[in-house]
């Protein structure tokens, strides 16, 4: 762990340099490929890992090799993963989805911003130096129209976004011919429906049923379509955002790009400090993945941090502000009801959700019902006009394993199920947020309760952390729970970094959290039996057995760390072709010995076979030519 501490000025300067010098970059021995669709000019980006050939025989002077197929993998890095694309953070990313949105002809550009706060910020000349220069003119659904992917799915329409997703979810596995790589153990899916091939129609059907969501605000055309649902690959979210204590716009944009490089399927901007509006604009215009927020955080800033002073009007203005910037999903704590708050009184750790505690304080101070619950239909109307998905927040999630699975937690969950049905009346897409801190033996009940209470809407959980004794290592404690609940059916896992409970994560913390959660998500996909999930594992195992060190590094989730660990003890180039590593050395490597046993067994088989043929030859009289027997 690095002990170097940078000053705030140095941190900002470093982030600014990262942004100024940013260019599309591929992982080692990987290249960007695009898989085309049947319509809509769809080009789905993937990363293809090139592999070296296997030595199968021959001599030192004339070796014989067998080619190994390149392995395609899911890629969240967007244009940042393509060396052929010119990157300019000042201009933002290309608007991939704009032609699809325009072709539907059900939205229109606004003459002015709907949010009073946005109009106020735009009129402030003092913010010019902070403002993103290429502001979009926001769109909204035409009168009487709904522009959500759920609306289209229910109408039987397969959108370009759905076809894009179908290609992406198949991960290019149709390109793989090797039976060794295609081999896969049957999974245990706990009722998940996993087709051998994901089609656009299957995507449409899952969205129409509410079992999956496509977070895709019409004002975020830069995003590459992705899907969150139990019957698809398990996804991972990364949290970024400034606070009143630390971080800047430059650092948050850097963390966004860094997150997509290391596999974040979505990113939540949880900023609570200065310039929230301006920071979010920079993030959205440069994000190839969906962006989520917790609007109550910014609404609280607008009333100077005093929860009691929150109003529906201030919150509504915040929803409009963020929807017209392009936020793809809102976390809304509408299930924290007044009558549930006393249920938390006997908890060891009370209410640990920021949003949940804000709304609980408001309810108690006014002795009124949660205004998010009271105005939920109006929230849905706003979301339907921009296609903002709802992530129904678990404001009463347990903050310690002692409080897991209690009355408050499940009471709120049941209310979230009721709100889900209301949102669906407006064709608004919904996912459900979950805990939290839950010991391993109590995790599965959370998934079962969510499926039953929330009508199979996608589940999105923070971990859960399986023990409370490891500050500094909570990416491990939560990664265990994340892998388990992903296997049981959770659709998206919110990462936890090593800084959880300790401080705001930096760039390296973001990477550590994401790698941990990509492992958890992939382990869950393997356990569920997601088609094609084992291809990369098989390729890695084959490379490992054949001592193809470069391929092992390049197939890893983190090639740089894998290479660095190997080179700590065997830095020479000869170490990259050696048939051993520093753990066992040349005489005790199990795989080298296994290869020798295999070669010996093959030789013995040949020798025994020759002996059998010799005996057969003698038994028939030792004649070179035998007479053909008469029929």
Curated annotation (Swiss-Prot):
The keyword Transport does not apply. Substrate binds at residues 239, 268, 297, 333, 353-355, 394-397, 433, 460. Pathway: Cofactor biosynthesis; thiamine diphosphate biosynthesis. One of its GO terms (molecular function) is 4 iron, 4 sulfur cluster binding. The keyword Aminoacyl-tRNA synthetase does not apply. Zn(2+) binds at residues 437, 501. Binds 1 [4Fe-4S] cluster per subunit. The cluster is coordinated with 3 cysteines and an exchangeable S-adenosyl-L-methionine. InterPro entries: ThiC, ThiC-associated_dom, ThiC/Bza_core_dom, ThiC/BzaA/B. Homodimer. Belongs to the ThiC family. This is Phosphomethylpyrimidine synthase. It comes from Salmonella heidelberg (strain SL476). The gene is thiC.
